[in-house]
Amino acid sequence: MRPSAPPSSMTSHGLLRRRAVALALVAAPALWLGARAQPAPGLRATPAQTEGPFYPVVFPEDSDYDLLRNGALNYPEGQGAWLEGSVSDLAGRPVAGAQVEIWQCDHSGHYHHPGEGARADRRFQGFGRVTVAADGRYRFRTIRPVPYSGRTPHIHVKVRQGARELLTTQVYVADDPGNPRDFLWRSLGAADRAALTVAFAPGGDGLRASFPIVVAA
């Protein structure tokens, strides 16, 4: 028969084992969360750009996803287009509940803004805001942006989460001849141009443009 270990030795080994298990249980979630927080391969934050001078001072009563319908008024000008995509963080997780805003000029190049007087077409909503779905998706119905003096076609985009502003940027039209002459588009590096320049391709119910947004949420 083997002699039993001294009681003090058994107690010491038992305490050490219990401590090791407890430490492992505490460390495991932290390690898992740390791994989850790491950027997904190939993901980089969407480049920021200036807000510009025409962010709305007064938001329209109708501020939904459809910029081609302002209240009871329909906007028949320009090329109808859908701008859609997703909002995710650097780990690729949807930023559910975030708000995406867009604003742009009408087909004649005028914004709904005091600096433009009353020249903007009141049938064009000009500004829209949507809340990102659980899967991170968002969608707007608008027009293909048009140029105006000094600027190539673009749409302004802002992303918020509660009181936090996560991103302000601009979206450009791929292959537009005005891009190389635009001072803001020219200021972008190759990777940033690729991230902010999207194709407006023909679809069944208008042009379609996909603009994925990645933020450091």
Which residues does each PLM region occupy?
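N-terminal signal peptide c-region/cleavage motif recognized by signal peptidases
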Residues: 32-34
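Polar low-complexity intrinsically disordered regions
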Residues: 1-12, 37-39, 52, 152
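Beta-strand-dominated extracellular/periplasmic modules and repeats
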Residues: 38-197, 202-217
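N-terminal secretory signal peptides and thylakoid transit peptides that target proteins
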Residues: 2-29
